[in-house]
């Protein structure tokens, strides 16, 4: 089972090709299955099909039922309106996403093209994780600095 967020997880369907969990979201049908509770389904631009085609997976929360994340660049977007075009919004908020820059479907990529694309995806994931660890470290460092300054102030009194 592949975890997208604390809320959404993906189970493999019988007809889905066997592949590592990391690669399953390249498959349009896998992304589309995450939109089972999507609030916009008819008479709008941001249908589940168009959202999945734009690379998004649906990862709702109690407070934000329309949160989506690009499986590739990891950009999260919410506050969707019925007239919002998923591909246009994706390009506007994450213009450097290589997935939306593809000129063909992921299923049509050569092995070499796919592996190069996936290498970039892994770099993005690692950078995001590294940034998260840096933020946590800086928060702890600031907390410790505050304690040290308090100790110093107590000693000088």
Swiss-Prot record:
Principal place of residence: cytoplasm
Pfam families: BIR
Keywords attached to this entry: Cell cycle, Cell division, Centromere, Chromosome, Chromosome partition, Cytoplasm, Cytoskeleton, Metal-binding, Mitosis, Nucleus, Phosphoprotein, Ubl conjugation, Zinc
Positions annotated as BIR repeat: 31-101
Binding, Zn(2+): 70, 73, 90, 97
UniProt note on tissues of expression: Exhibits strong and homogeneous expression in developing oocytes. In embryos, expressed in the animal hemisphere from one-cell to yolk plug stages, and highly expressed in the future brain and dorsal region of the neural tube at the neurula stage and early tail-bud stage. At tadpole stages, expression is restricted at a low level to the head region.
Gene Ontology, cellular component aspect: chromosome passenger complex; cytoplasm; kinetochore; midbody; nucleus; spindle midzone
GO molecular-function terms, A-Z: metal ion binding; nuclear retinoid X receptor binding
Residues found modified as Phosphothreonine: 47
Post-translational modification note: Ubiquitination is required for centrosome-targeting.
PANTHER family assigned to the protein according to its UniProt record, in alphabetical order: BACULOVIRAL IAP REPEAT-CONTAINING PROTEIN 5, DETERIN
Domain note: The BIR2 domain is required for vascular development.
Family: Belongs to the IAP family.
Description of how the protein assembles with itself and partners: Component of the CPC at least composed of survivin/birc5, incenp, cdca8/borealin and/or cdca9/dasra-A, and aurkb/aurora-B. Interacts directly with incenp (via N-terminus). Interacts with rxra; the interaction is stronger in the absence of 9-cis retinoic acids.
Function: Does not appear to exhibit anti-apoptotic activity. Plays a role in increasing blood vessel size during development. Component of the chromosomal passenger complex (CPC), a complex that acts as a key regulator of mitosis. The CPC complex has essential functions at the centromere in ensuring correct chromosome alignment and segregation and is required for chromatin-induced microtubule stabilization and spindle assembly.
Protein name: Baculoviral IAP repeat-containing protein 5.2-B
Source organism of this protein record: Xenopus laevis
Organism placement in taxonomy: Eukaryota, Metazoa, Chordata, Craniata, Vertebrata
């Amino acid at each position: 089972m592949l975890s997208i967020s604390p809320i959404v997880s993906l189970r493999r369907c019988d007809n889905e090709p066997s592949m590592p969990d990391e690669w399953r979201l390249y498959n349009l049908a896998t992304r589309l299955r995450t939109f089972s509770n999507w609030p916009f389904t008819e008479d709008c631009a941001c249908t589940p099909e168009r959202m999945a085609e734009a690379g998004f997976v649906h990862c709702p929360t109690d407070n934000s039922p329309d949160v989506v994340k690009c499986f590739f660049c990891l950009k999260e977007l919410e506050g969707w309106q019925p007239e919002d075009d998923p591909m246009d919004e994706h390009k506007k908020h994450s213009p450097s996403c290589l997935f939306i820059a593809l000129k063909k479907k992921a299923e049509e990529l050569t092995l070499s093209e796919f592996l190069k694309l996936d290498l970039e995806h892994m770099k993005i994931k690692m950078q995001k994780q590294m940034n998260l660890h840096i933020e946590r470290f800086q928060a702890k460092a600031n907390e410790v600095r505050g304690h040290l300054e308090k100790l110093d102030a107590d000693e000088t009194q």
